[in-house]
Amino acid sequence: MPPRKAHTTRRTPAKKSGVRRRLLRLLVTGVPVLALCGVAWLWLESVRLTRIEIVGARQADPGELRRLAAVDSGAALFDLDPALIADRVARHPWVQAASVTRWPTGTLRIAVEERVPVVLQMDAGGRPLRYLDAEGYGMPPGRGPVPDVPLLYGVRGPAHPMRPLEDEPVRALLTTLAALEDPARALISEIVRAPDGEFWLYTTPAAGQRSVPVRLGREDFERRLRRLVAFWQQAVLTQPHKTFSLIDLRFANQIVVREEAHPSTQKSAMGHE
């Protein structure tokens, strides 16, 4: 068998020239890019914090938010951790969420989303104590406009400023109130939790009516408040000549009311539609 001939591949001058051209192009384009990246990195390292911008704070004091952020003026801006700063700011009672953006101009932008108050909790002496949101978190009176929310009496806590109320019936009621439309929410002036745990509402005086006590009970708040709104629109606002002294929502198939037609008082029951 004849021996095999070894084949070798030789690069032609044209191929060698093409490789050189590609290497040259890489050098021409790559070196400036690397240099530019280096300059950009050095420039970012040189950017210093010159301003802290607070956005979205209406009730929370911007000065307190800056203090919670705990960043020094003149610090290297892009060495700061946005997530860490946002977590610090979110410890403010009014702040539900926070986000932090670093701008090359030297500005640190802190945007906050504040909690929405549902009621104003009153202390045992009838003085404003704190606002409560839908989740049961407490917020102290803020610096902005006074929120128009019902007053809440007879409730303790929350025990910790960073934790919500542990009272489940109260939290259920707060969630229900937060979901109400504005006209329905405006119907409620005060909420009282009696020593036996039962909730009473007092309506906002309107249409010739005094504030009417409403017996809400201990549960099923969403359905009962819907029935109250429907009854108020259909039976109270349409009959301004009638004076109601009590509305009882505890029964499944009817709303029990007490009317004051004359000096005498009579009881009546109205079926729920």
Swiss-Prot record:
GO cellular component annotations of the record: cell division site; plasma membrane
Cytoplasmic side stretches: 1-20
Keywords for this protein: Cell cycle, Cell division, Cell inner membrane, Cell membrane, Membrane, Transmembrane, Transmembrane helix
Periplasmic topological domain: 44-273
Gene3D superfamilies: Cell division protein FtsQ/DivIB (3.40.50.11690), membrane protein fhac (3.10.20.310)
Subcellular location: Cell inner membrane
An example Gene Ontology biological process: cell septum assembly
Domain POTRA: 47-115
InterPro entries for the chain: Cell_div_FtsQ/DivIB_C, FtsQ, FtsQ_C_sf, POTRA, POTRA_FtsQ_type
PROSITE patterns linked to this entry: POTRA (PS51779)
Segments traversing the membrane: 21-43
Topological category with respect to the lipid bilayer: Single-pass type II membrane protein
KW Transmembrane helix (keyword) present: yes
Function (record text): Essential cell division protein.
UniProt family annotation: Belongs to the FtsQ/DivIB family. FtsQ subfamily.
Protein name according to UniProt: Cell division protein FtsQ
